């Protein structure tokens, strides 16, 4: 008789102002890979839905509740877990770290943010899961403005530019980027400004969720050059 366990793993990205894209990792308190870094996650309880399981694990192991969370992919290669045959349903999530204080508990010894460009050695097949999640994130930016989940409620346009440039990993045509974003009506201009250094004060914007929902029904593709 087969004995296959079902688990969930969460790839949670965060963005600190003008820094690299960050990834949430936990330090394992138990074997296997005790003391090693891994994605938050664990086995699904018998009476638990998958979505509830990943939210529980994130709360228990890191003390956070993502602003955006969706199923990513299912991983089930033989031998991916040395203990049992384990099939893991991975999730992709986004949080604004400014609003979330990490708190490790349960079977996590610690929880920290790491730059996606400087990750430590990882347990299980979690490096592969992260690579697939990063590709999905970069693709989704082309048709769904999920990046706004990583910004403050009010933000200067330069922060949005920096975020997109950081996630896709290359320079963008700033003039074309601004023109496209503004033409879609996805931003509401506020009466507030933000002054940084000796430069001109920047106007602050908010994300227009209603406008996005209208565009989503019509179908649109936001190509970043």
Each language-model region and where it sits:
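Active-site segment of metal-dependent pyrophosphate-handling enzymes
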Residues: 4-6, 52-55, 59-102, 117-118, ...
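N-terminal strand-loop-strand
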Residues: 1-37
């Amino acid at each position: 008789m087969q004995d296959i366990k079902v688990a969930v793993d969460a790839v949670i990205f965060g963005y600190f102002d003008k820094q690299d894209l960050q990834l949430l990792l936990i330090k394992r308190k138990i074997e296997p890979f005790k003391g090693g870094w891994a994605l938050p996650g664990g086995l699904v309880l018998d009476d638990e839905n998958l979505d509830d399981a990943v939210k529980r694990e994130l709360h228990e192991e890191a003390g956070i509740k993502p602003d955006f969370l969706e199923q990513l992919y299912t991983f089930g290669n033989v031998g991916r877990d040395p203990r049992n045959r384990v099939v893991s349903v991975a999730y992709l999530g986004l949080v604004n770290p400014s609003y979330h204080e990490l708190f490790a508990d349960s079977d996590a010894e610690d929880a920290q943010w790491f730059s996606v460009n400087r990750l430590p050695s990882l347990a299980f097949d979690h490096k592969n899961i992260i690579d697939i999640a990063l590709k999905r994130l970069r693709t989704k930016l082309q048709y769904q403005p999920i990046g706004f989940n990583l910004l403050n409620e009010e933000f200067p346009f330069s922060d949005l530019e920096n975020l997109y440039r950081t996630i896709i990993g290359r320079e963008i045509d700033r003039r074309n980027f601004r023109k496209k974003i503004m033409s879609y009506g996805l931003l509401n201009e506020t009466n507030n400004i933000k002054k940084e250094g000796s430069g001109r004060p920047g106007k602050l914007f908010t994300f227009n969720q209603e406008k996005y929902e209208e565009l989503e029904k019509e179908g649109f593709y936001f190509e970043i050059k």
